[in-house]
Design a protein with these regions (language model features):
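Phosphate/diphosphate-binding loops
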Residues: 74, 78, 84-86, 236-238, ...
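Active-site cofactor/cluster-binding pocket
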Residues: 1-200, 204
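Short, basic, glycine/proline-bearing loop/turn elements
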Residues: 46, 63-69, 227-230, 251-258
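Short secondary-structure capping/turn micro-motifs that flank functional sites
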Residues: 44-45, 213-214, 221
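Contiguous, well-ordered alpha-helical segments that form the cores/surfaces of helical PPI scaffolds
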Residues: 121-126, 191-199, 214-218, 239-249
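Glycine-rich phosphate/ribose-binding loops and adjacent secondary-structure elements
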Residues: 21, 217-251
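Active-site nucleophile and cofactor-binding loops and adjacent substrate-binding regions
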Residues: 12, 39-42, 184-189, 208-210, ...
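Short, surface-exposed connector motifs at secondary-structure boundaries
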Residues: 6, 198-204, 224-228, 249-255
Length: 259
């Protein structure tokens, strides 16, 4: 069985936890790895405790593993409740809190804002797992556009790893060569539901946005022209169910979703 590595990024809402996790997932996917990931977050615009966890391997991965190889805290204190999740020899990176030091506050402010902490973290992770730097920068640039500070942030995180954690790089087991040439895509659960509805012949989707089902509505709305379906956002869930039932009674294939 192929070795599975698991990484968790933790921090407050608004710190870019999910962005860093999604970008790492894209880099791993483009590098040929198999992966499973998930995020946890409260119903807050800022603050609270958010995490993004990824398990990846050269072989197929069928779930997110509980024990962590690497834990990175984007802000003070967000690593503490996950200490017991660490594997023996696992690495915890914090900002001057007694673990492996990653001075995210200082490094990001040198670039002008705390918002770059997540991209610095991504650069460090790419270094630690000996992933392809050129490919990673291409994905970062595509995601953030022409903002050169994000590229500088990635470079600073990568260089910090080179200068301080050379001895812990997993290059013997993880490498920058493409593991699998088989083309794979990354989808979340809601997108998978949306694809399933489309492939099943859906012609109308009516829904009121309510977490966690909102993603299905957004996915189908974004693709309604390509899929040749009608997406309706009515005033409430009862109206959505009524529209779906009416379309079905008229001979259409319809669906609705809520939480």
């Amino acid at each position: 069985m192929e070795k599975v590595w698991t990484v968790k990024i933790a921090g407050p809402a608004g710190a870019g936890v999910k962005s860093a996790g999604l970008l790492l997932a894209q880099i791993l996917n483009e590098s040929g790895y198999f992966l499973k990931d998930y995020s946890e977050y409260p119903s807050l615009v800022r603050g609270g405790h958010n995490t993004y966890q990824i398990s990846f391997s050269k072989g197929e991965v069928f779930g997110v593993y509980q024990k962590l190889d690497v834990l990175i805290s984007l802000s003070a204190g967000h690593w503490q409740e996950h200490k017991k999740e660490m594997k023996k020899g696992g690495l915890i990176f914090t900002d001057n809190e007694g673990e492996n030091n990653l001075p995210l506050n200082e490094m990001s402010l040198q670039l002008g804002s705390r918002i770059y902490a997540n991209t610095i973290t991504l650069g460090l992770l790419v270094y630690l797992f000996a992933l392809d730097k050129k490919l990673s920068l291409k994905i970062v640039s595509k995601h953030f556009g022409e903002n050169e500070n994000n590229q500088r942030a990635f470079e600073s995180g990568f260089k910090y790893g080179e200068n301080n954690f050379r001895e812990v790089v997993s290059s013997e087991e993880v490498n920058s060569k493409k593991v699998s040439s088989k083309k794979k895509i990354i989808v979340d659960g809601n997108e998978a539901v949306g694809w399933g509805l489309y492939k099943a012949g859906l012609n109308l989707y009516a829904a009121y946005p309510m977490t966690p089902a909102t993603g299905v509505l957004h996915f189908l709305a974004k693709n309604q022209d390509e899929f040749n379906i009608k997406v309706v956002h009515p005033e409430d869930e009862i109206a959505a169910a009524s529209i779906a039932c009416g379309n079905s009674m008229a001979g259409g294939r319809s669906a609705t979703g809520t939480s």
